[in-house]
């Protein structure tokens, strides 16, 4: 338990910390990487350069300080972050390193005095223990599953399939010939890469793009312009190569009774977690609607597969939007609507108040979808979404 004195001090000084803004997290990361450069093998340095990770940390610090007397309000965020941490193999010792640099940053930028530093130190220790406990439980759960493991495990690339001009699928099988653990549709894998051309080890999370299988995992990756890892996977990784994988994780997953209707909404490579869900919903007892937006036919991954499912199963329907169709793209055959996703076009399919919505894509797209769902009076508990990269509140 956190002492009342600590709660009072943290809440009183939280506005001062908040006013420091991005300067605080920039100083923190610079300090930490200077003193502990080995952590560059864990943190996504691309997210450091674009500021996403700094923003995420700053938001987390402010949220914790503002809710220090109501930790239950933080549990959803704790669950999301804890799953991500397990895919990075974060350890209790690393929490000590981070805490030390966070307190030193507050001291160096604000000079608040020892009493304030002690209060923030106590508060950080309590939160760190919450994460350490939850993450250890996830590690144990992953290890105890049939086909499960702790840490990383060597896998061999057995199939590489181009799904569109920008998306390629990679299927991995355990190098030891064993089985793989089950996962929940919507979850992701952590992949660890250390090519000679990389300055640091690179760790990325990619959504699993099929329903669970017993002997392999499939991810589908978009080639990002300037993306170090995605371009390496597309250009360099070949069948027979090996990689290290962390066990599946993630708090965004299909979790509804078989009688609950579901709508899956995606844009671009955001279809990967929802495709895993669709793959698992072929025997669902309620309606399933697949709504997907992409640039045009050359970017449209898994078109034939999704259409085959929609033709085969009466409870599955599929609707597609192309933002800028090519001259060769045929309306009503290759796509249904032009432009951005407009849920009014399929409003008759979305009238059941029990329906759950799962969506993923670029942040702007998800904000667009969330706004429309709210306008349709969809209950917040029925809305689920995933951000690729640091989480953002829509």
Swiss-Prot record:
Gene3D superfamilies linked to this entry: Globins, Nucleotide-binding domain of ferredoxin-NADP reductase (FNR) module, Translation factors
Pfam family, one: Globin
Function: Is involved in NO detoxification in an aerobic process, termed nitric oxide dioxygenase (NOD) reaction that utilizes O(2) and NAD(P)H to convert NO to nitrate, which protects the bacterium from various noxious nitrogen compounds. Therefore, plays a central role in the inducible response to nitrosative stress.
Name of the protein described by the UniProt record: Flavohemoprotein
Chain positions of site Influences the redox potential of the prosthetic heme and FAD groups: 84, 386
InterPro entries the UniProt entry points to: Cbr1-like_FAD-bd_dom (IPR008333), FAD-bd_FR_type (IPR017927), Flavoprot_Pyr_Nucl_cyt_Rdtase (IPR001709), FNR_nucleotide-bd (IPR039261), Globin (IPR000971), Globin-like_sf (IPR009050), Globin/Proto (IPR012292), Hmp (IPR023950)
EC number: 1.14.12.17
Binding site for heme b: 85
SUPFAM superfamilies the record matches: Ferredoxin reductase-like, C-terminal NADP-linked domain (SSF52343), Globin-like (SSF46458), Riboflavin synthase domain-like (SSF63380)
Binding site for FAD: 188, 204-207, 387-390
Active site residues per record: 95 (charge relay system), 135 (charge relay system)
Catalyzed chemical reaction(s): 2 nitric oxide + NADPH + 2 O2 = 2 nitrate + NADP(+) + H(+); 2 nitric oxide + NADH + 2 O2 = 2 nitrate + NAD(+) + H(+)
Spans annotated as Reductase: 147-394
Family stated for the protein in its record: Belongs to the globin family. Two-domain flavohemoproteins subfamily.
Keyword Hydrolase: no
Residue(s) at site: Involved in heme-bound ligand stabilization and O-O bond activation: 29
Domain FAD-binding FR-type: 150-255
Gene Ontology biological-process annotations: cellular response to nitrosative stress; nitric oxide catabolic process; response to toxic substance
Cofactor(s) named in the record: heme b; FAD
Positions that bind NADP(+): 268-273
Record NCBIfam families: PRK13289.1
Keywords from the named record: Detoxification, FAD, Flavoprotein, Heme, Iron, Metal-binding, NAD, NADP, Oxidoreductase, Oxygen transport, Transport
Globin domain residues: 1-136
Superkingdom: Bacteria
Cofactor note: Binds 1 heme b (iron(II)-protoporphyrin IX) group per subunit.
MF terms (GO), sorted A to Z: FAD binding; heme binding; metal ion binding; nitric oxide dioxygenase NAD(P)H activity; oxygen binding; oxygen carrier activity
